[in-house]
Amino acid sequence: MSLDLEALIGKGRVERVEADASAARDRLDEARHHLDSAVLIAKTDPAGAYSLLYDAARKAIDAHMLMSGYRVTKSRLGGHEATARYAALALGSGSHGESARRFDRMRRNRNRSEYGAWQIGRSTVEADLVHARAIVEAVDESFG
């Protein structure tokens, strides 16, 4: 992971910061709450549920970054894409690796829904809720 992470740092996509375990745990708690909320509204508001499950996964990845002493560079566009690249590097080889690698597809789905004309259906929510949960679980496990 370090060589590819160094490339993200070198390209100005990710930067080193002081690790902050307290902030990381708070962010992971937010992710869990988003997952719970997504489940509650999935049948009546699939698009809203998808935004919540995507944000849950993203915030969990952000929590991993904070715990590890990194963050996405704030001064550049494409922060969520950099988050996806980090997820694939940092979480992509463990038992939840497939879900971490699918985060970028989830990002693109969410963008198409937010900025395009694509409607998210319940089956997409159900499928990606599995991956969002796995990402949150992977980050939780990494905290020890």
Cite the ranges covered by each PLM segment.
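Terminal alpha-helical segments
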Residues: 1-144
